[in-house]
Amino acid sequence: MNKQRIYSIVAILLFVVGGVLIGKPFYDGYQAEKKQTENVQAVQKMDYEKHETEFVDASKIDQPDLAEVANASLDKKQVIGRISIPSVSLELPVLKSSTEKNLLSGAATVKENQVMGKGNYALAGHNMSKKGVLFSDIASLKKGDKIYLYDNENEYEYAVTGVSEVTPDKWEVVEDHGKDEITLITCVSVKDNSKRYVVAGDLVGTKAKK
């Protein structure tokens, strides 16, 4: 085999490998979005579990990659509701407690004994730095944007009051503040776990779910 042929084969192999490396993140992102859509469709008309939430320290959970999100299996026994944010086209299951497994499939509760529409309803979600996947888009929310929670009986409507950036030790953001509100928390990026984006919103209405 002459040198020219060897060079050609090596060049082709490098091209193929390069294409795979470049294309894999896009493929994983597509699969993650597809899995998320399937999860939402699966929970939209199901009977949700009771609000029996527990505290799990999510700060000790490693940041997953898109392939892990795409391959995660939704545990329907953990689903207690659904969250919808129309302004960023977000639709996710709400799962009880921020376990590693639950955070791969949707938004997860942060505190013990959380009840939708009462006190500070806090939810955590991964920022995958990929539009349309989990909590990647919540930092772009604006004051007045609507957030909707759903359980078996009701739709809870919240209006965003602000978005801030805090360090992970600022647990006061999820504490009750004497009003009915919502708090959404995520890392600032898939590569940066040193700070959190925090979205705050006030409850503006509750009505029976259609």
Curated annotation (Swiss-Prot):
One of its GO terms (biological process) is proteolysis. GO terms for molecular function: cysteine-type peptidase activity. The record marks 196 as: Transition state stabilizer. Residues 1-5 are cytoplasmic. Coiled coil: none annotated. Transpeptidase that anchors surface proteins to the cell wall. Recognizes and modifies its substrate by proteolytic cleavage of a C-terminal sorting signal. Following cleavage, a covalent intermediate is formed via a thioester bond between the sortase and its substrate, which is then transferred and covalently attached to the cell wall. This sortase recognizes a Leu-Pro-x-Thr-Gly (LPXTG) motif, which is cleaved by the sortase between the threonine and glycine residues. Important for growth in macrophages. May be critical in the early stages of inhalation anthrax. The keyword Hydrolase applies. Disruption phenotype: Disruption of the gene results in dramatic attenuation of the growth of the bacteria within J774A.1 cells, a mouse macrophage-like cell line. Disruption does not affect the development of acute anthrax disease in the A/J mouse model. Its main location: membrane. Changing residue 61 to A: Decreases sortase-mediated cell wall protein anchoring. The active site is at 126 (proton donor/acceptor), 187 (acyl-thioester intermediate). It is a single-pass type II membrane protein. The gene is srtA. One of its GO terms (cellular component) is plasma membrane. Belongs to the bacterial sortase family. Class A subfamily. The keyword Ribonucleoprotein does not apply. It is found in: Cell membrane. It comes from Bacillus anthracis. The chain crosses the membrane at residues 6-26. Its EC number is 3.4.22.-. Inhibited by thiol-reactive reagents. Residues 27-210 are extracellular. Keywords: Cell membrane, Hydrolase, Membrane, Protease, Thiol protease, Transmembrane, Transmembrane helix. Contains a unique N-terminal appendage positioned within the active site and in contact with catalytically essential histidine residue. This appendage modulates substrate access to the enzyme. It may increase the efficiency of protein display by reducing the unproductive hydrolytic cleavage of enzyme-protein covalent intermediates that form during the cell wall anchoring reaction. This is Sortase A. It holds the Pfam family Sortase.
